[in-house]
Amino acid sequence: MDYDDSDFQNQNLHLAGEANNKFPPVLQPYALPKFDFDDTLNTHLRFDSLGESEAFLGIEGNEDNNWIEDFSRGSSGIVFSSGATESCAISRHNNVWSEATSSESVAMLLNSVGQDEVIVREDTIKKSDTSHELGCTMETVEPGQTSHERSLSKEETVNLQPNPSVDDTPGESSVVKTDDGQEQVLVKDDSPTAVEEASVEEKNSILTSNTATVEAIDTTDLGKIGTETTDNLLDQTEEKANVESRMEDDCSDGNVQTIITCSGELNNQSTLLPETSNDENVISDHIQSSYNRNDLTADARSILVEGHSDSHIDSASEVEKVEAENIGKTAKPDLKEIELSDVTVLERGDQAPSTLEVGGQDVSGTECQDLLVSTVHTSVAVEASLELAGELTTITNSVSIEKPELLSHQHMEVITSEHESTFQIETETYPQIHVFETSESVYISTMDSMVEAREGGVSKKSDNEGSARTSNLEQSMELPVNANDRDQDVKNSQILSESVVSGSVGYVSGGSTSELAESESQSDSIPTDKSETMIDSSLNLEELQPLSQDGAPAVSLTSSIDLHMVKTSSDDSDQGSYSETKKVYGEPENGQTVPPVDASCSGSQMDQEARKRAEGTKQSTYSVEGCPRSEGSKDAVDADGVGQVLQQQSEELIFEENVVTEAVKAPETLSVLDKDNKNEMPITSSLPILGSEAGKDGQEEDNTAASGGIMAAGTPVTHPKGDAIVLGDSRASTCSESSVKSYVTAIEDAATNLKTPLDSFPTVKTSELQFNNTETNSVKKPEDQNISGFMSAGSPVLNRNETSSSEMNLTPDQLKAGKISKAVIFSQATLVSPIVVGSPSTSSLDKTAAKSSKAKSERKPRRTSKSVGKETSRKGTSVKGATPIEQFQSGGKTNAVNQSLASHIQITQSTEKQRSLQSPALKAFGSLSTPTASLPDLNSSALSSILRRPFTDLQQVQLRAQIFVYGALIQGTAPDEAYMISAFGGADGGKGSWEKSWRTCVVRAQKSLVATPETPLQSRPGKTETPSAGHTNSKESSGTNPMIPLSSPLWSLSTSVDTLQSSSVQRGSAATHQPLLSASHAHQTPPTQNIVGHNTPWMSPLPFRNAWLASQQTSGFDVGSRFPVYPITDPVKLTPMKESSMTLSGAKHVQSGTSSNVSKVTPTLEPTSTVVAPAQHSTRVKSRKRKKMPVSVESGPNILNSLKQTELAASPLVPFTPTPANLGYNAGTLPSVVSMTAVPMDLVSTFPGKKIKSSFPSPIFGGNLVREVKQRSVLSEDTIEKLKEAKMHAEDASALATAAVSHSEYVWKQIEQQSHAGLQPETQDRLASAAVAIAAAAAVAKAAAAAANVAANAALQAKLMAEEASLPNASDQGLPKSYDSILPGQGTPASILKGEGAVVNSSSVLIAAREASKKRVEAATAATKRAENMDSIVKAAELASEAVSQAGILVSMGHPPLLNKLVEAGPSNYWRQAQESQEVQPCKTVVLEKETVSTSEGTFAGPKIVQTEFGGSVNTADGVSGPVPATGKLKGQEGDKYADLAKNNDVVFEPEVGSKFSIDAQQTIKATKNEDIKEGSNVEVFKEEPGLRTAWYSANVLSLEDDKAYVLFSDLSVEQGTDKLKEWVALKGEGDQAPKIRPARSVTALPYEGTRKRRRAALGDHIWKIGDRVDSWVHDSWLEGVITEKNKKDENTVTVHFPAEEETLTIKAWNLRPSLVWKDGKWIECSSSGETISSSHEGDTPKEKRPRLGTPALVAEVKDTSMKIVDDPDLGKPPQTGVLNLGVSENTFNIGKSTREENKPDPLRMKRTGLQKQGSKVIFGVPKPGKKRKFMDVSKHYVSEASTKTQERKEPVKPVRSIVPQNSGIGSWKMPSKTISIEKQTTISRPKTFKPAPKPKEKPGATARIIPRKDSRNTTASDMESDESAENRGPGSGVSFKGTVEEQTTSSSHDTGSKNSSSLSTNKGRVAPTAGRLAKIEEDKALAENSSKTSEGMEPRRSIRRIQPTSRLLEGLQTSMMTSKIPSVSHSKSHLSQSKK
């Protein structure tokens, strides 16, 4: 029964058609591409897909075909996304499909269905148990359950369920669990359960997802509560309340057939709810409900809404939502808190909580993590049950919040136990009050702190209940406590989008809730509260019913479910589920039509968003806006309009809600809150909105419930909409609410009429469940599965009720409800769809519902399992599901959805068909769901009985026909029409629903026949699809989508479901086998694929490989466009639709990774512009077309797009997202382009990301341009317009830049005026900062304008190229086909193969080869254009980097220069003048200058910004990322920056050895000159007084008179007062004594606020040596001391002795700064001996080596790419700045070019390496052997130095290298390895000769490091170097060394090392020649600064590099060098090799 993932995969491969061609469809073992339903099938790959496909196919006789559905569903439909299945390791009972097509297999299928189904039922139930077991073997703990009753109850529930035995087992497990000490047991069991669940998932997706998850949690809870009370409850419920009877009746109507006991439990629950008095019953009933996986879940929720008080439901909803949010982000922390409180109340509730816990842990334990989510969902289910009982509700909510297993279980327990006792006791007494209190306390606990909840609960309820509630709430609250400031968070959530997401979400919800709760249940004032109140007031089912009539009840139900969903969302949010939601969220606001597309894209994006909570927050905010809009609609909708409005708004809402849940649970909530303003909390706001809407409608209860539910989840947005409520819920809460309502409707009004509102609500609820499921899927596979199951359990039932009973019954209402439901379903998508399908399939709605929910649950989990490892995947599926719905609903794409859902509708029923426009879309999305629905049937007792029933002849015929249809589809051929008719059954075989799709399939199959069989997706695209690809693909895709629900195995051919298939499409497009890889691997591996995988996998394997491929990545979001795709049945007409399918292909082709990025990007994009997502789809479609011009397109927009895509994950470059396919295309087709892409990416992020992204790139590259390019009509007018638009953007940017510049000038003028006003220092600082910032902004604006212009040109060029490539290719059908398969990489085999998702078949290879040959010519021409394009892009990047670097420097300035300095410098001259002004004569002055230049004490700009010919363009500082593509590499930003800077010749990278000191020194130097001390100046005053430490104290100059300064001490107070000490201090010292006052040194010595690296670079990089004189920051003063000891373990810790204080302290390096010495009337940094510095850095390397490195600091002047070493006597003097401002020479100088060797990059790297190696590497001693060699070499070299030099001279290359290493290792790195060895030798000998050299050497090393950074952006060292460079920025040392290194490198390379060798000949000689200037500089200082600064940061890596290059170097050196030199050579070699690397 179980299959290994690999096994399954193999089967899938076969099924997918890996070998499909080879075998007849009948004989082929269809290892189906993991159909979604298959994945859902935890037990077997069954014909659920058939049943589902039946639904999908729109078979009319759904009910008649229930046997099929039951049969299939039992095995949980086949899910095509094998990836998901694999990820979850879901096994199936039998690979039914392998034998599916043969008669024997049919017979076997029937048998297996009977047996397997039964087994599955059992498994499912057991799984359910397992789920419970997930929670723990809890379910097996039957005897230990809180009461025998429970176990019985559970058993009864089991009996109700199809598999009584299974149910019993779960019940028992639950009981045992409970007995164990539920929480612990649950927790303990959870892990095993999780494992078990995982296996279950592996075995049976259905079980895991549906049965296990839903049932596990629900059952567990039910088992605990239900076991005791299930029977009793059932009886009691029936006995107890009038509502109960209604509920029962409804339940019976809806659930009677469903053996799950949906009706019974529903009845019980309903009764319980109304009867508040029987809380225990409610709980147990609810538990039963939960127990009945889907039905129970739905029931519980519906009951809560109906039977329980609305307040309970609401509160539960809210709590759940909050919890969900918390769980997602803060669930885990909360869990811990809750655990404590929960434990306290665990006694009675233990069982229930344990059950929940089991579910939760199960999830966590599961490899897929679905269980976790599942657990959460389970918790939710339990919560729903709890909600039935007032206290239980609270606990449930609490659990939901917990989301982590512990919390949910514990909460459950607490509430359960209290509930049971309190409720039982007080049930009668406080029917409504009880509910009321519960709701309130739940609310409070969830929203507010638990304390608040307790208060509310206690005060309102009897002590018992209050206590229970309080404890429950407490637990709940504790979860939220995570976000204790939830309310605050809500308010700040937008700001704190990210933090809010994790903790805030919960809090936001919590805070609002608590207020709402406090506001009270009556809380009309606060809708949330109101909803609670309303719930309270309408505790009775009667009230619920009215609500249900109004549609308000849906809201209440939504509440409960909302929380559930939120919970799931929360979890998913982290993983990306939220992102999806978020994406959707934003879209709804944007527009219904677009949002669907976005939703489709959401799948991938979700992950991204999850990663980017902030982004998510934005989206959530956006969604919120939509929400209010929805709200407005809500009033209108609340009554009849609810369904319709809901549909439209629902989509929006769903998206919004998802967004909220996913990305920024809290922030989104906040957004909602803000917009809604109704509630303080987002949840609150949601609820309030709903409430208010409901209030308007006059349905208090309904409103409250709905609003509350929605609120919790992010529903807030939804709630405000009214429809939005449903939708929001449908996303998060809506579904659950709808589910509840659905149940209520089904139960209460199922027999009666599901009232429109009710109907829509049920729909909503289903949606929410689905959404939860979706989120769960995304979040964790195991958890997701469980959650899915759980959600499915509730949702499917609701959906089923809704569709089967309610929907079918209420055709008109259904349409409304259907829309709502559809929206909901869409959000849930897969789950809902299957449910709907299931219901139609089963004749009895209830049974179907139960089955559906179960199957759905399972199925969804399977889907999720598919993407076990990938939240995105899962999310994608769910998103897919949700998105399509949302898209349909929100977007005007409902038509498309309807079409794609048509089959679903047919399957579901004619009634469902009515909903088909809405619901079908869901189903299409939820194709998997549909199978899931079937699966649930199998799991239910009714199902089991059905399974046991023999098939009728007609059924057998139908099943066989379905098998054949499916086989044909798998094979990629069109099924026979006769088979289709038979398969669908009914009078006309449901022809109306599938004929279009079928015809499309036939056409597509004919066109792609050749490619389909063996060729992978690509081959199809390459082959027949080409011309028809555009039309056929779009048509087929659209056709596929409508025709085939994602889950429908039969519909693997592309149909309307193409959207769904998008992911599975890759499978289908790849051909049967290709789909295998594509679906299973692609879906599994890439998040996008995963997204697709859940829904589309089984669909994709079939006919539309290409389109499907494309859709893989964007399938989730593309679903939106897919709807259009459906309409796209007209091939080319619907570009968006085409885009969708094409885009998907492109995305998929692009690469899984790219796809994922793209998807993620899409969500990001969505918020920016809804159009973008469609554009993206468009783009993708165009990509297909673009295939013609793969190269050209790539080069321009594609590259940008790809860059953006790549960056998208990290940066919000959504605009380029639309070209994910292009990116893939680029990468696949043109590796070179890809690399270039990398550069543009940096550029994009740096500049386009900021500017172009929003304005230009988005429209042009965002997808419009690309899309246009990709369109068949090569360059459409649209594209041209986009290009024009881009040009306009560039012009606008220019104008903006001009404005910025003018503004900057104005500001500067103002500053100049102000500078004379004698403003306070703070004011001056602010002004200076503002001026700098403005200058930076102006610079950036300029750069941006230039870049925009360049980009526009590049885009135009790319467009032209695309046209060139496209036109011919467009005519070539083969190309379009290829395009489909490989949108972006059509031209290159690599792209084809890559695009295929790593699925390489012979066909794909052939196609790739073919494509490669076709494209060779194109590539040649395109390459040139591309090169030009890249050039332009690089130029733009350079400009951007320039601007950024300038801006970065400005921004990075630790504190702004004085106003007068600023004024002196002026806006354009500021930097240079600042440098000069800072220049100081002392050697350290240079360093100081450099620091000054960067003006960032905290952040040191590694490169010095020199005003060169570039016109003062500043290179990027360390912190600033200004990648200059000139290098052609875009690796580390910093490295890139440096490299770019170097290339720009504007920056000289200097080691910042003394950077910390440099700044200090600069300021110190200024201080030295009294002129620097002015009024308002910050100074340091030296005080030696008794009672005071003798130290330098910070002070502020208040006034200056007579050479005295009146200072106010910052840290010294008057002896007995709080006033700061003020005193007069002489500005000058007596005689030669140092003055007691000096300008304050920068805070460099203080901990930097920047990155640790920077701080370390600046401070830690300073290598402190023993004996160094330092100032230590101690007790707010700088104490002068001497380092006496260094901590060997911690480099950053030194022992400093303070002679003045006669004490020794251990100080951290960052609290040290070099002491300043008064010398020659100046403050000069007293540098430690070079040895000290080197030693500290070296660690390994001998100090001698450092000295060797250079006696004087090396200053490099770069001229004509050659560096001249200047001996700078005073590094600190202006010459240094001159060096820094290397003007023309620097401009000319290119680091890469500096060596002038063929290996320019290598030389650069070498430089870096050399510096690093000799510096940090040697110091750190990474290369120990190298060190030894070095030492040995030193002696040897010393001896043979002359000979070496001679050799070097003779061998230019060798000498150069040797020379360079001598200088700093940089040169050596650059130089040939042999040369390096020589140099090293020489260098080593020098160290012996001259020790100071090592320091210079070190400096050079540092410099080299920095420089190498520039060169080796890609190298790991680059990062280090950049850091080190930042650290070692000491201008003097860094520059001097750089000069030496560079010059040496240059000269060595140029002079063949003759010069170098000569310079190296003598220790000093070498240093001096290479760095003659350095020689003049004080060697000690230079050495100390440089070596110390360079050594630390950079050396370690360099050392490592040296080691690596050693072998190479040695090889070369050994041959050409003396053996004595070899050792050193080897070391230098290692440097070289690393640099090369």
Curated annotation (Swiss-Prot):
<feature type="region of interest" description="Disordered">
    <location>
        <begin position="141"/>
        <end position="179"/>
    </location>
</feature>
<feature type="compositionally biased region" description="Basic residues">
    <location>
        <begin position="1179"/>
        <end position="1189"/>
    </location>
</feature>
<feature type="compositionally biased region" description="Polar residues">
    <location>
        <begin position="1025"/>
        <end position="1041"/>
    </location>
</feature>
<comment type="function">
    <text>Under salt stress, appears to prevent the accumulation of reactive oxygen species (ROS) in roots and required for the maintenance of cell wall integrity (cellulose, pectin and lignin composition) by interacting with importin alpha (e.g. IMPA1 and IMPA2) and binding to the promoter of several ROS- and cell wall-related genes to regulate their expression. Necessary for cells organization in meristems and root elongation zones as well as for root elongation in high salinity, but not upon osmotic stress.</text>
</comment>
<feature type="region of interest" description="Disordered">
    <location>
        <begin position="567"/>
        <end position="637"/>
    </location>
</feature>
<feature type="region of interest" description="Disordered">
    <location>
        <begin position="1148"/>
        <end position="1197"/>
    </location>
</feature>
<feature type="compositionally biased region" description="Polar residues">
    <location>
        <begin position="2013"/>
        <end position="2023"/>
    </location>
</feature>
<dbReference type="InterPro" id="IPR008395">
    <property type="entry name" value="Agenet-like_dom"/>
</dbReference>
<feature type="region of interest" description="Disordered">
    <location>
        <begin position="837"/>
        <end position="893"/>
    </location>
</feature>
<feature type="compositionally biased region" description="Basic residues">
    <location>
        <begin position="2028"/>
        <end position="2037"/>
    </location>
</feature>
<feature type="compositionally biased region" description="Basic residues">
    <location>
        <begin position="853"/>
        <end position="865"/>
    </location>
</feature>
<feature type="region of interest" description="Disordered">
    <location>
        <begin position="1793"/>
        <end position="1812"/>
    </location>
</feature>
<feature type="compositionally biased region" description="Basic and acidic residues">
    <location>
        <begin position="1794"/>
        <end position="1805"/>
    </location>
</feature>
<dbReference type="GO" id="GO:0010468">
    <property type="term" value="P:regulation of gene expression"/>
</dbReference>
<feature type="compositionally biased region" description="Low complexity">
    <location>
        <begin position="841"/>
        <end position="852"/>
    </location>
</feature>
<feature type="compositionally biased region" description="Basic and acidic residues">
    <location>
        <begin position="454"/>
        <end position="466"/>
    </location>
</feature>
<feature type="compositionally biased region" description="Polar residues">
    <location>
        <begin position="1151"/>
        <end position="1171"/>
    </location>
</feature>
<dbReference type="Pfam" id="PF05641">
    <property type="entry name" value="Agenet"/>
</dbReference>
<dbReference type="GO" id="GO:2000280">
    <property type="term" value="P:regulation of root development"/>
</dbReference>
<feature type="region of interest" description="Disordered">
    <location>
        <begin position="1729"/>
        <end position="1748"/>
    </location>
</feature>
<dbReference type="GO" id="GO:0005634">
    <property type="term" value="C:nucleus"/>
</dbReference>
<feature type="region of interest" description="Disordered">
    <location>
        <begin position="686"/>
        <end position="705"/>
    </location>
</feature>
<feature type="compositionally biased region" description="Polar residues">
    <location>
        <begin position="515"/>
        <end position="526"/>
    </location>
</feature>
<feature type="compositionally biased region" description="Polar residues">
    <location>
        <begin position="158"/>
        <end position="176"/>
    </location>
</feature>
<dbReference type="GO" id="GO:0071555">
    <property type="term" value="P:cell wall organization"/>
</dbReference>
<comment type="subunit">
    <text>Interacts with importin alpha IMPA1 and IMPA2, required for nuclear-localized proteins import.</text>
</comment>
<dbReference type="GO" id="GO:0009934">
    <property type="term" value="P:regulation of meristem structural organization"/>
</dbReference>
<feature type="compositionally biased region" description="Polar residues">
    <location>
        <begin position="1942"/>
        <end position="1964"/>
    </location>
</feature>
<feature type="compositionally biased region" description="Low complexity">
    <location>
        <begin position="504"/>
        <end position="514"/>
    </location>
</feature>
<feature type="region of interest" description="Disordered">
    <location>
        <begin position="1841"/>
        <end position="2037"/>
    </location>
</feature>
<protein>
    <recommendedName>
        <fullName>Protein SWOLLEN 1</fullName>
    </recommendedName>
</protein>
<dbReference type="GO" id="GO:0009651">
    <property type="term" value="P:response to salt stress"/>
</dbReference>
<feature type="region of interest" description="Disordered">
    <location>
        <begin position="1011"/>
        <end position="1045"/>
    </location>
</feature>
<feature type="compositionally biased region" description="Basic and acidic residues">
    <location>
        <begin position="147"/>
        <end position="157"/>
    </location>
</feature>
<dbReference type="GO" id="GO:0009506">
    <property type="term" value="C:plasmodesma"/>
</dbReference>
<dbReference type="InterPro" id="IPR014002">
    <property type="entry name" value="Agenet_dom_plant"/>
</dbReference>
<feature type="compositionally biased region" description="Polar residues">
    <location>
        <begin position="1874"/>
        <end position="1886"/>
    </location>
</feature>
<keyword id="KW-0346">Stress response</keyword>
<dbReference type="GO" id="GO:1990841">
    <property type="term" value="F:promoter-specific chromatin binding"/>
</dbReference>
<keyword id="KW-0539">Nucleus</keyword>
<feature type="region of interest" description="Disordered">
    <location>
        <begin position="504"/>
        <end position="531"/>
    </location>
</feature>
<feature type="region of interest" description="Disordered">
    <location>
        <begin position="454"/>
        <end position="487"/>
    </location>
</feature>
